[in-house]
Design a protein with these regions (language model features):
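Active-site alpha-helical elements of protease catalytic centers
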Residues: 1-18, 228
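Conserved N-terminal subdomain of the carbohydrate kinase-like
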Residues: 10-96
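Hydrophobic beta-strand scaffold residues
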Residues: 15, 41, 124-125, 188
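Active-site beta-loop-alpha junctions enriched in small/polar residues
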Residues: 99, 129-131, 158-160, 193
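Structural recognition of alpha->loop->beta junctions
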Residues: 38-40, 138-162
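Distinct, well-ordered alpha-helical segments
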Residues: 82, 108, 134-146
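Anion (oxyanion) recognition and catalysis
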Residues: 9, 35, 115-119
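Conserved phosphate-binding/catalytic region of the ribokinase-like
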Residues: 115-119, 139, 165-229
Length: 229
């Protein structure tokens, strides 16, 4: 979510971030750098006796692919009390991060944000985050779409296949076209690496070609920045 907010801000959008860091060295750097990029980040620090600020050790292979070893730490302490109503009401799109669908309090925070956003006539987006996250919460993620809690879904093709438990791309895309609440518009954006992306709705599927790149250096955050515009 943070990378996506930074990406949107770098393109001139007004962006804010709601998330938890602790008042430790990494947390203070994170808060400073987010605000310095133009992303409004004012969520209160996490409990000083709780977990440290999240961090990730990332291994990048010569082909640009990455393996992430992540400690979620303080970010899992997000609660409904952290959801700033004015921030959510003022956002045309509230972007939810699937990684944080683990703790019960964070789920309640998500639901509060959805209620505020929809009451203000705004839209809610969800990113599936990774295939392991999808495997843990497949039913709940699908329920969010089918009950109208989310209006926009972001995923890569591996996450989409995991969502529908199929190895066949066409089968997964066909199932996705049927998703969403019947009384709300639903849109999905699926990335497919060098094959570009798919825009999927009940009206059909539109393929968008990828921009050709001679040398891939590091794919870390590529999907996040794609979602940021």
């Amino acid at each position: 979510g943070a990378n996506t907010a930074v990406g949107a801000a770098s393109r001139g959008a007004r962006a804010g971030f709601i998330g938890k860091v602790r008042d430790d060295e990494l947390g203070r750097i994170y808060r400073h750098d987010m605000n310095a990029t133009g992303v409004r980040f004012e969520t209160a620090y996490a409990d000083p006796d709780g977990p440290a600020t999240a961090r990730s050790f990332i291994l990048v292979t010569p082909d640009g692919e990455r393996t992430m070893n992540t400690y979620l730490g303080a970010c899992q302490n997000l609660s409904p009390a952290d959801i700033d109503e004015a921030t959510v009401r003022g956002a045309k799109i509230t972007y939810l991060e699937g990684y944080l669908w683990d703790p019960p309090a964070a789920k309640e925070a998500f639901r509060k944000a959805v209620e505020i956003a929809h009451a203000a006539g705004n839209r809610v987006a969800l990113t599936l985050s990774d295939s392991f996250c999808v495997d843990r919460y497949r039913t709940e993620f699908l329920d969010l779409a089918r009950t109208g809690a989310i209006d926009i879904l972001f995923a890569n093709i591996h996450e989409l296949k995991a969502l529908y438990e199929t190895a066949d791309e066409d089968t997964a895309v066909a199932a996705l076209r049927e998703e969403g609440h019947p009384q709300r518009d639903f849109l999905a954006v699926i990335t497919r690496s060098e094959r570009g992306s798919l825009i999927v709705s009940r009206a059909g599927t539109h393929a968008v070609s990828a921009f050709p790149v001679e040398t891939l250096v590091d794919l870390t955050g590529a999907g996040d920045l794609f979602a940021g515009g």
